[in-house]
Design a protein with these regions (language model features):
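Conserved alpha/beta-hydrolase "acid-adjacent" motif
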Residues: 256-265
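Conserved alpha/beta-hydrolase
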Residues: 74-100
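Catalytic histidine-centered segment of alpha/beta-hydrolase-like enzymes
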Residues: 283-295
Length: 305
């Protein structure tokens, strides 16, 4: 085990520490410079010491489920938490602009990340996010790619305290058929993940209320563009070009989308560059581990607290 990059194995622990945090989460609708609408959530703890920019995964509606995650993140880090819907995957159903989609179909994420940053900037310019003395970024799945690509721009807000990547996908080169096969394998593990929430009444209440909320909408052209970005290794390339002091990594031991060999390669590269941070493995679960509230709370503590 490296002191610089400690290895942490998290057993599947169904315990959910404490009650749901009572932290205010505000919802905003953003439309910067005439662009399509996206929703944003901002969670503000008492006396925040910085901002945590959270980049969610594919097909993530900003309802009761994500609201509760924001509250936990804000409580564990004492940071203001901000996230937006992913451009091209919103409750409003507006597509990714054609020029940006064309770049994504070439495997390039930069223009899409810039579009996402425009919405984050709108939240900051609106005065809803003001605590930027330090900045952390957190991504899950697709959000890992957006977080990594956005990090140089986020550094303009304030000093980057850390990058936190849960189940990064775009660290492996594979064709679209393989990506979909791995996605289906992991999707088959979803019932086990959701079962970890049973017995926690307020979590299940949030889950049921989430199903009554509008889902995000996206078209086949945008789905293909996002899949193309995720089927390459651009996240790893961006990470190699970024200067940072700390990067925490996490994956599920049974994950197919975040392959172990490629995950280990990213960890080894960070180690060789002297970049600290834990490398966490959640035992017994796959890619969808972020849908388990017990796992989320333990991961937040291991990676961010």
């Amino acid at each position: 085990m490296s002191a610089l990059r400690p290895r942490i194995s998290l057993p599947l622990d169904l315990h959910l520490a404490g009650r749901r945090p009572e932290i205010e989460v505000a919802r905003h609708t953003l439309r910067p410079a005439g662009r399509a609408r996206l929703d944003a959530l901002v969670a503000t703890p008492a006396e925040p010491r910085g901002v945590l920019v959270y980049f969610p995964g594919f097909n993530t509606p900003l309802g009761p489920w994500e609201t509760a995650k924001c509250q936990y993140l804000a409580q564990a880090t004492s940071m203001q938490v901000v996230l937006t819907e992913i451009p091209g995957m919103s409750r409003y159903g507006d597509p990714i602009p054609r020029a940006i989609r064309a770049e994504m179909l070439r495997g390039r994420i930069g223009a899409w990340a810039d579009l996402n940053l425009a919405y984050l900037s709108a939240a900051i310019d609106g005065g809803w996010v003001a605590h930027t003395a330090t900045v952390q970024a957190l991504g899950y799945s697709t959000g890992c790619s957006l977080a990594t690509a956005a990090l140089p721009a986020l550094a303009e807000l304030g000093p980057i305290d850390g990058l936190n990547l849960v189940e990064p996908v775009a660290i492996s080169r594979r064709n679209l058929a393989s990506l979909e096969a791995h996605n289906m394998l992991d999707f088959g593990r979803m019932p086990l993940v959701l079962a970890t929430n049973l017995g926690h009444d307020w979590v299940m209440s949030a889950y049921r209320r989430q199903w009554r909320e509008p889902s995000v909408k996206y078209g086949p052209a945008d789905l293909l563009a996002i899949a193309t970005v995720l089927s390459g290794e651009e996240l790893s390339w961006h990470l190699d070009d970024i200067e940072l002091a700390r990067c925490a990594l996490a994956r599920g031991s049974r994950s197919s989308l975040c392959r172990r060999a490629d995950f280990e390669k990213v960890d080894a590269s960070l180690q060789a560059r002297g970049i600290g941070g834990p490398t966490v493995t959640v035992e017994g679960l796959g890619h969808q581990l972020w849908h388990s509230f017990p796992v989320v709370t333990h991961l937040i503590e291991a990676m961010l607290a």
